[in-house]
Amino acid sequence: MTVLQEPVQAAIWQALNHYAYRDAVFLAERLYAEVHSEEALFLLATCYYRSGKAYKAYRLLKGHSCTTPQCKYLLAKCCVDLSKLAEGEQILSGGVFNKQKSHDDIVTEFGDSACFTLSLLGHVYCKTDRLAKGSECYQKSLSLNPFLWSPFESLCEIGEKPDPDQTFKLTSLQNFSSCLPNSCTTLVSNHSLSHRQPETVLTETPQDTIELNRLNLESSNSKYSLNTDSSVSYIDSAVISPDTVPLGTGTSILSKQVQNKPKTGRSLLGGPAALSPLTPSFGILPLETPSPGDGSYLQNYTNTSSVIDVPPTGAPSKKSVARIGQTGTKSVFSQSGNSREVTPILVAQTQSSGPQTSTTPQVLSPTITSPPNALPRRSSRLFTSDSSTTKENSKKLKMKFPPKIPNRKTKSKTNKGGITQPNINDSLEITKLDSSIISEGKISTITPQIQAFNLQKAAAEGLMSLLREMGKGYLALCSYNCKEAINILSHLPSHHYNTGWVLCQIGRAYFELSEYMQAERIFSEVRRIENYRVEGMEIYSTTLWHLQKDVALSVLSKDLTDMDKNSPEAWCAAGNCFSLQREHDIAIKFFQRAIQVDPNYAYAYTLLGHEFVLTEELDKALACFRNAIRVNPRHYNAWYGLGMIYYKQEKFSLAEMHFQKALDINPQSSVLLCHIGVVQHALKKSEKALDTLNKAIVIDPKNPLCKFHRASVLFANEKYKSALQELEELKQIVPKESLVYFLIGKVYKKLGQTHLALMNFSWAMDLDPKGANNQIKEAIDKRYLPDDEEPITQEEQIMGTDESQESSMTDADDTQLHAAESDEF
């Protein structure tokens, strides 16, 4: 028995769209066994890839010569997923053995898929440290399709500064049209018509969801060719032969359910359902909020307008359900194989859960207006193609109706109780068309086309405006202009602001500013509104680590690991949880697990490096930080970690170099400037160190670490009065920090005011008798202080000589304060 290719393809896509991957794979394998074509090969590989079997798709495509752009792109995608970057590059751009393809060559070869192809190629270039080429590919991809976000995101992450105003714009009609699907929905809104002429709203049948289970394929005594008449091979996906359209209850577009859909779900692109219709996101007023699973709201409008003339409800039509104007066309349910002049369209069923008011589908008859070179949608090729024709004498497909509707072999009639004149007047306006225009296959649709295009353009421009604002905020964040990023993102519309992605970026910005309380507040809101979000939670876990909130951190790590054990963010949170409990060995295992889950996750390498520093395994820590830099050269946290190790090893020149490298990436970090100042002071560059610390304090005037180090440098340079003034200001910021009082006591002793010195030494000892609860050390990073190491107590320091006091300040306090900031980043 010959397999019908098109129905099987539609069934496969339906299974894929309903996530029935096993069924899709099985059917695709059967189809490929029957028809060894490029299309069947691509469909089978797609099923493998979507079911998570990229290696199967790779081997399948690799074993066959891929000549179509779709197969090439999918094979390259599999190569990238399997870390075969060189092979993927050769497929997309030619590689070493073939001529290198230019961007124009790629656009010519891949057509509408060129924007995605260039984005994938840019990813390959960036992974192989060819950032300039990668940047060019990303920029070209955005110029072809400004609706893409990931290329812009990647440009920002590699250090480029794309202009959102120039990136997210519709430069031309061609640019706009290339981003639209081949088939769109039609919306004709003409309020100037009489109320007696209801408006017709046409929605296409959902793509690739033809209900094949309602088709009764009669194969006995008949043979079906794989294709039908080539004259209708380019029609829209909703235009299906009447013999093949499954009928069901509630399909009439004249039902009130079109207007009375339940208003559920978010509005366009994430707006809440309660959003006022007077404040649309993208420049147009939403006609109705889609129900969950209803994709018609995001579909564009076609350039054709199809209208019908409804017969009187009291006298059901004997020939058809709906007629075109006054012409005597053949019945839309005619069983003749010769009726090819007019191909009817079945309007998509409404998804309303309310009572059905119509039991007979309304069939519209549009003209074929798609261009000859337009590719039909997958669902439209159910029984249409251009390679062969259906025999006129072949038996037609028989409809299987729902149980409530008897299977009629005669022409369908309008149910008297299904449609009433008030229903028509309340819901739709119908325009009658001249029969001569219909017979010629032409419909005057200039006005509806203009209206539809204007609506499309307004919606697209609204989206571009939103992407521009979000792009500016993300660019500022990647440039570490955190305050600017917070300001931009905070001014987004409330329904976009209150989403997980936006709030995570704001929380990350607060984290980079060391405003951990604000960051914790933002991330907790993310957890409230999107408790399924994993991205960004590694920053949240580090924020909780800084705030010493062990209970909240434990709850977070438990929830994340239960939700997704294949997420590196979850294991990073678990590692931070045990690190806070000083269970460093367990924390190391969890960070290693995060790396095992995602070897390209730079932050896991950084956290693992900090844990190795705590266990004094500096060589392993160096290897971790270097791996983080290998994965992401702009990961300044790893450069900082290397600098800290070299500082601990008293390799101050190397430490300064690595700190400076981190500062080049994040020039707004007061903490990095502070560390550079400390290293410069260790290199006997005291004046330069003071200038650096002054810059750090300008960026963050209330940073206690910077002020403490500046006071220490002033004290070392014998500028006691200036040091004392600095410490008095610092005492107002951290009134319970014992080290501040201890340094004040040392200053007073140098000034000869012994009684004041003893008083401050006593206060320092009262605040921290064992020297183990210093806020500055803990807030910055107590991880660099081994568990069994206790700071020199104030009593020991008071009893020692001046030289021993200075040494203890430098070795015990100063070094720990500077060198212990790993999770500041």
Swiss-Prot record:
Principal subcellular localisation of the protein: nucleus
- Biased-composition ranges, Polar residues, are 326-341, 363-372, 381-391
Per the record, residues carrying Phosphothreonine are 205, 209, 244, 313, 367, 431, 447
Which cellular component terms (GO) are annotated to the entry? anaphase-promoting complex; cytoplasm; nucleus; spindle
BP GO terms, sorted: anaphase-promoting complex-dependent catabolic process; cell division; metaphase/anaphase transition of mitotic cell cycle; protein branched polyubiquitination; protein K11-linked ubiquitination; protein K48-linked ubiquitination; protein ubiquitination
Leader peptide range in chain numbering: none
> Which Gene3D superfamilies does the entry link to?
Tetratricopeptide repeat domain
**Keywords for this protein:** Cytoplasm, Cytoskeleton, Nucleus, Phosphoprotein, Repeat, TPR repeat, Ubl conjugation pathway
- Region (Disordered): which ranges? 305-423, 782-825
Q: Where in the cell is it found?
A: Nucleus; Cytoplasm, Cytoskeleton, Spindle
Biased composition range(s): Basic residues:
396-414
InterPro entries from the UniProt entry: TPR-like_helical_dom_sf, TPR_rpt
Question: In its keyword annotation, does this UniProt entry include Repeat?
Answer: yes
Tell me where in this chain the PTM Phosphoserine is found.
291, 339, 380, 387, 427, 436, 439, 822
Please indicate which superkingdom the organism of origin belongs to: Eukaryota
Pathway listed: Protein modification; protein ubiquitination
TPR repeat ranges per the UniProt record: 6-35, 38-65, 67-99, 115-145, 465-495, 499-528, 533-563, 567-598, 601-631, 635-667, 670-702, 704-734, 737-768
Spell out the Low complexity composition-biased ranges.
Answer: 349-362
> Post-translational modification, briefly?
Phosphorylated. Phosphorylation on Ser-427 and Thr-447 occurs specifically during mitosis.
**Which protein family is named in the record?**
Belongs to the APC3/CDC27 family.
Purpose of the protein:
Component of the anaphase promoting complex/cyclosome (APC/C), a cell cycle-regulated E3 ubiquitin ligase that controls progression through mitosis and the G1 phase of the cell cycle. The APC/C complex acts by mediating ubiquitination and subsequent degradation of target proteins: it mainly mediates the formation of 'Lys-11'-linked polyubiquitin chains and, to a lower extent, the formation of 'Lys-48'- and 'Lys-63'-linked polyubiquitin chains. The APC/C complex catalyzes assembly of branched 'Lys-11'-/'Lys-48'-linked branched ubiquitin chains on target proteins.
Known partners and oligomeric status: Homodimer. The mammalian APC/C is composed at least of 14 distinct subunits ANAPC1, ANAPC2, CDC27/APC3, ANAPC4, ANAPC5, CDC16/APC6, ANAPC7, CDC23/APC8, ANAPC10, ANAPC11, CDC26/APC12, ANAPC13, ANAPC15 and ANAPC16 that assemble into a complex of at least 19 chains with a combined molecular mass of around 1.2 MDa; APC/C interacts with FZR1 and FBXO5. Interacts with RB. Interacts with FAM168B/MANI. Interacts with MCPH1.
Its protein name is Cell division cycle protein 27 homolog
Q: What lineage is on file?
A: Eukaryota, Metazoa, Chordata, Craniata, Vertebrata
What gene, per UniProt, encodes this protein? CDC27
